[in-house]
């Protein structure tokens, strides 16, 4: 019989840099997960994506075993990297802080496609463009 999921833990952790320190340790400790086992496995799986923030969904089973799924980095992180800025605009409707091209948006949409609820690449691009606009970025052709 399949193991029964007791709890889902969702975290965003820098790739290859999971440590037992907060916020990772307390979240996993409350769920009863072997913290060192998770951090070693996560760091090994995400070592090639250094510098990115990786969302992870951890399924904790009744017997305290676990498995996890890593997702693609958030669109905002990918957009900031593409534009070369530290953070978005505090007032995106008034102050534009950066410009991204449609080619960059398409590249990000292709990267994010497995995690987006989009039927095709055009719909995914529109989602990424919306995120860019809400961050105070201008999208150019």
From Swiss-Prot:
What is the top-level taxon of the source organism? Bacteria
Q: Name one GO biological process term.
A: translation
Q: Which modifications occur after translation, per UniProt?
A: One or more lysine residues are methylated.
Q: What Pfam families would the database entry show?
A: Ribosomal_L11, Ribosomal_L11_N
Q: Which residues form a coiled coil?
A: none
> Which CDD domains does its entry note?
Ribosomal_L11
| Molecular-function GO terms, alphabetical | large ribosomal subunit rRNA binding; structural constituent of ribosome
UniProt cross-references to SUPFAM superfamilies, sorted A to Z? Ribosomal L11/L12e N-terminal domain (SSF54747), Ribosomal protein L11, C-terminal domain (SSF46906)
Cellular component terms, GO, for this chain's entry?
cytosolic large ribosomal subunit
Its keywords, alphabetically, are: Methylation, Ribonucleoprotein, Ribosomal protein, RNA-binding, rRNA-binding
Q: Does the keyword RNA-binding apply?
A: yes
Q: Looking at the keywords, is Magnesium present?
A: no
The record's comment on protein family reads: Belongs to the universal ribosomal protein uL11 family.
Family annotation (HAMAP family)? Ribosomal_uL11
Record text on subunit structure and interactions: Part of the ribosomal stalk of the 50S ribosomal subunit. Interacts with L10 and the large rRNA to form the base of the stalk. L10 forms an elongated spine to which L12 dimers bind in a sequential fashion forming a multimeric L10(L12)X complex.
Role played: Forms part of the ribosomal stalk which helps the ribosome interact with GTP-bound translation factors.
The molecule here is called: Large ribosomal subunit protein uL11
């Amino acid at each position: 019989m399949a193991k029964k999921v007791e709890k889902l833990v969702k975290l965003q952790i820098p790739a290859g840099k999971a440590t037992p320190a907060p916020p990772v340790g307390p979240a996993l400790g409350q769920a009863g997960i072997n913290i060192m086992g998770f951090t070693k496995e996560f760091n090994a799986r995400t070592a090639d994506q250094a510098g990115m923030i990786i969302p992870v969904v951890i399924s904790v089973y009744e017997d305290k075993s676990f498995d996890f799924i890593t997702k693609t980095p958030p669109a905002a992180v990918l957009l900031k990297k593409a534009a070369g800025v530290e953070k978005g605009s505090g007032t995106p409707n008034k102050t534009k802080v950066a410009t991204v091209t449609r080619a960059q948006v398409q590249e990000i949409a292709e990267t994010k496609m497995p995690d987006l609820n989009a039927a095709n690449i055009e719909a995914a691009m529109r989602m990424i463009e919306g995120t860019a606009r809400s961050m105070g970025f201008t999208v150019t052709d």
